[in-house]
Amino acid sequence: VSFIFLFVLFGAILDTAGGGKYFINLAFALVGKMRGGPAKAAILASGLTGLISGSSVANTVTTGTFTIPIMKKSGLPAVKAGAVEVAASVNGQIMPPIMGAAAFVMAELLGISYFTVITHAFLPAVISYIALFYISHLESVKLNIRGLPESEIPPLGKTFLSGIHYLIPIFILVYLLLIERWTAASAVFYSILSLMVIILVREVLAAKKKNLSPFGGLKFGINEIIAGLEKGAINMINVAI
């Protein structure tokens, strides 16, 4: 399936630009104070990361290195902390708009559009994460695991606004797929272009804010995009195999 690489590339560039870290911080800001907050934040972070990554391995590595130590610190046994992260990351493969490679193969073999696949996958994906939330809550009650202290939780408003630009390419992708009914390849191609523009503009503005040369910011943004392209190529190897 020729357009799989474009979706892998989109997720890799967005993650390299800081999208993965943004979703983790946003998850902790949203549910970190709840009972068993670290486990629930890990589930939500993996679900949000699943929006941009169809790889359960990449999802686990991206979120797990941060969430598992916090879950263990809160009192959750190491085995259960690992189980929560793996279960949430594996479910990320069925979270639209970017799903696992099997979704693309399914669309081609059945002769249906990728749009049809993701619309039918959305509700089961949401239900699966609700179930994980419920199970983690029961475990937290049983083990008497509290939420994180206020001092360790990032402020919600500030956190959301700090990375709202990461949501723009995802919105464009969903809009082109679901509303305009573009082909998957065309939708993700223009989403990648919009993401690259956002990265370059962000770095130029950041450089000007620090009274540095805009060309330095532009160069940094280009290097960031190149790093994302390299990561996308590496991630595609696992899909191809």
Where are these regions (language model features)?
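Flexible loop linkers connecting adjacent transmembrane helices
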Residues: 20-31, 66-70, 111, 142-153
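Hydrophobic transmembrane alpha-helices that form the pore/transport pathway of multi-pass ion
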Residues: 26-92, 98, 102
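Core transmembrane alpha-helical segments of multi-pass membrane transporters/permeases
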Residues: 1-21, 212, 216-241
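Helix-coil boundary and interhelical linker segments in multi-pass alpha-helical membrane proteins
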Residues: 107-123
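Hydrophobic alpha-helical transmembrane segments in multi-pass membrane proteins
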Residues: 3-7, 37-38, 42, 46, ...
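Long, contiguous bundles of hydrophobic transmembrane helices that form the permeation core
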Residues: 119-235
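Alpha-helical transmembrane segments of multipass membrane proteins
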Residues: 47-48, 90, 105-109, 171-175, ...
